[in-house]
Design a protein with these regions (language model features):
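Glycine-rich ThDP/TPP pyrophosphate-binding loop and its adjacent helix/strand module
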Residues: 110-281, 285-290, 409-518
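Non-catalytic terminal/interface segments that mediate subunit docking, oligomerization
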Residues: 67, 250-359, 365-375, 457, ...
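Cofactor-binding active-site loop characterized by glycine-rich and histidine/acidic residues
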Residues: 43-165, 284, 302, 307, ...
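Peripheral docking tails and interdomain loops at the edges
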Residues: 266-277, 388-390, 410, 535-587
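Active-site nucleophile and cofactor-binding loops and adjacent substrate-binding regions
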Residues: 41-50, 70-74, 102-123, 145-149, ...
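A glycine-rich helix N-cap at a beta->alpha junction
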Residues: 87-98, 164-178, 371-383
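N-terminal amphipathic, basic-rich helices that act as targeting or association modules
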Residues: 1-83, 206-207, 215-221, 234, ...
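Glycine/charged-rich beta-loop-alpha catalytic/anionic-binding loops adjacent to active sites
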Residues: 31-38, 99-114, 136-142, 316-330, ...
Length: 587
């Protein structure tokens, strides 16, 4: 049987198919996604779960004139394949290839760039209001949002506004009861009751003055198309509740939805994971997870908080053993931080684990609710620095810059697993101020990291290597590349290496000693060069009237796209070879 998918280069070809051909197309699209992701890796389960919905949306609506927004974008692979990127899909998330998320500059079909959760309703509403103002009353605006994302505050803000407008917006709830981890909270239970048919009255969407329909089976393509055609004729804000299964069509992905969200390589035929050679090193997230559990067993005041990332943060270890003291609050970063602040006022010791890129979503809470009140919340910022294939929306390269200007906040970047473990130990002993601890995705550098705890003196850096006429100052785990680069440069004996550890407070005594001894200083960080660690050193040198040459190296003032961490480091000059070349040039 000839493949239908081979002849679809845009939704124009899709709409020429008879409706009874669409189940075959759905199977082909699933197979295509599975076969590519099996070898190239990526987000699997979410895209498999919306194959029928994706086809139906492009079949019924006149995209790209009608505007379609995918919340987060994990589920948009089918959308990309049907909108002219089938032949490029094998480059997904690879350096120079297509993005794993919708991007406006990649395709006219990507109406809004996404990557973070809960933005789709507000964006679609903005577009719908703009169309109203232009007099384009027939244009359709569709936001597809998951049950985990819709529980976020921003999604509710969008719904609240939509309900008092006459804007032509359709909100589709893709309800599969899971985000990356299982959905949580009262809204999740409400949606479960709706699916069971025991929540007929007091519909929360209708109460917001939005036309509600559903729930319907999101894998019954005829039913989905029929309902979309009906809703196309309904004016004003509309809400369609669609029930789907994450991982649909691949048995293992349906049964193990957390693992198969982004499973890595697997056998496309059997679905079995292709296991990687086990690393002798431990992931930083697991160092955090094991350490907080160990500390919590010794200190009854410790609590753990994560906004929807119990697996990714490894807080799940504490949640499994101490569920009453570890909290997954859902996609609710603002709430997570102020919850931690409230706990801190009552003598608890909250470890709030948030990916660096997601802390951006709760900046006011860090300032207003924590730092201003000097509440000793312990922020553990996972995925700091370059994260790799998820690209610009997920790199954690701004935290040093946006946190450094906040009074009363300690900022620490561990060089290795032992340092991470010891700063967590030090923080729970009782700091008088909040602290942000940033560490990267991936594995560490120390096999035997589980050493007895020792305290770290706040605001003190360390010298790792002596040198004659040049000093490299690094912060965090980039010290590994720096150490190797010094060893490989032409005159390693000339180059000293310092791990400053704290961006705030800076070790001013050590900086005075360095600036008095070395004429040339190089700062190296995996944060933006604008306002980060290097900027702090430059400010210190200027305020104290030093005239040394200070070279700042880090993430350039551009958004870094996707690729492996090693590839991206090489592109921006943070790999070992590039740092060695810089040392040779300046030495």
């Amino acid at each position: 049987m000839p493949k239908l998918l081979d002849h679809i280069n845009s939704p124009l070809e899709l709409r020429k198919l008879s409706q009874d051909c669409l189940p075959q197309l759905a199977q082909e699209l699933r197979d295509f996604i599975i076969n590519i992701v099996a070898t190239k890796e990526g987000h699997l389960g979410a895209s498999l779960g919306v194959v029928e919905l994706t086809i139906a949306l492009h079949y019924v609506f006149n995209t790209p004139e009608d505007q379609l927004i995918w919340d987060v974008g994990h589920q948009a692979y089918g959308h990309k394949i049907l909108t002219g990127r089938r032949n490029d899909f094998h480059t997904n998330r690879q350096i120079g290839g297509i993005s794993g998320f919708p991007k406006r500059d990649e395709s006219v079909y990507d109406a809004f760039g996404v990557g973070h959760a809960s933005t789709s309703i507000s964006a679609a509403l903005g577009m719908a209001i703009a169309s109203q103002l232009k007099g384009d009353t027939e244009k359709q605006h569709i936001a597809v949002i998951g049950d985990a994302s819709i529980a976020s505050g921003m999604a509710f803000e969008g719904l609240n506004h939509a309900g008092v407008t006459s804007a032509n917006i359709l909100i589709i709830l893709n309800d599969n009861a899971i985000g990356i981890d299982p959905s949580v909270g009262a809204l999740k239970q409400y949606l479960t009751n709706v699916k069971k048919g025991i929540q007929r009255k007091n519909n929360i969407i209708k109460a917001l003055n939005i036309d509600y329909s559903g729930p319907i089976d999101g894998h019954d393509i005829d039913k989905v198309i029929s309902e979309l055609k009906r809703l196309k004729t309904v004016k004003g804000p509309k809400f369609l509740h669609v029930i789907t299964t994450k991982g649909k069509g691949l048995k293992q992905a349906e049964e193990n939805q957390v693992t198969y969200h982004a499973p890595g390589k697997f056998n496309a035929f059997t679905g079995d994971l292709i296991l990687k050679t086990p690393s002798e090193f431990t992931k930083y997230q697991d160092v955090f997870g094991y350490t907080i559990l160990e500390l919590a067993k010794q200190n009854k005041h410790i609590v753990g908080i994560t906004p929807a990332m119990p697996t990714g943060s490894s807080l799940k270890y504490m949640m499994d053993e101490m569920p009453e003291r570890a909290f997954d609050v859902g996609i609710a970063e603002q709430h997570a931080i102020t919850l931690a602040a409230g706990m801190a006022t009552q003598g608890l010791i909250p470890f709030c684990n948030i990916y660096s890129t997601f802390l951006q979503r709760a900046y006011d809470q860090v300032i207003h609710d924590v730092a201003l009140q000097k509440l000793p919340v312990i922020f553990c910022l996972d995925r700091a620095g370059l994260v790799g294939e998820d690209g610009a929306t997920h790199h954690g390269v701004f935290d040093l810059s946006y946190l450094r200007c906040i009074p009363n906040l300690i900022i620490f970047a561990p060089r290795n697993e032992i340092e991470l473990r010891n700063i967590m130990f030090t923080a729970q002993l009782g700091l008088q101020l909040p602290i942000a601890i940033r560490y990267p995705r991936g594995t560490g550098v120390t096999v035997d990291w589980k050493q007895p705890f020792s305290t770290i003196e706040i605001g003190k850096g360390v010298q790792l290597k002596e040198g004659i006429n040049m000093a490299v100052l690094s912060i965090g785990t980039i010290a590994k590349n720096v150490g190797a680069a010094i060893a490989n440069c032409n005159y390693p004996e000339n180059v000293a290496h310092y791990d400053m550890r704290f961006v705030k407070p800076l070790d001013e005594a050590l900086l005075h000693a360095i600036l008095n001894k070395y004429e040339t200083i190089i700062t190296i960080e995996d944060n933006s060069v604008k306002g980060g660690f290097g900027s702090a050193v430059l400010e210190f040198a200027s305020v104290n009237d030093y005239r040394n040459t200070v070279k700042v190296s880090g993430i350039p003032d551009v958004f870094i796209e996707h690729g492996s961490v090693n590839e991206l480091q090489k592109t921006i000059g943070l790999d070992v070879e590039s740092i060695s070349e810089l040392l040779n040039k300046l030495n």
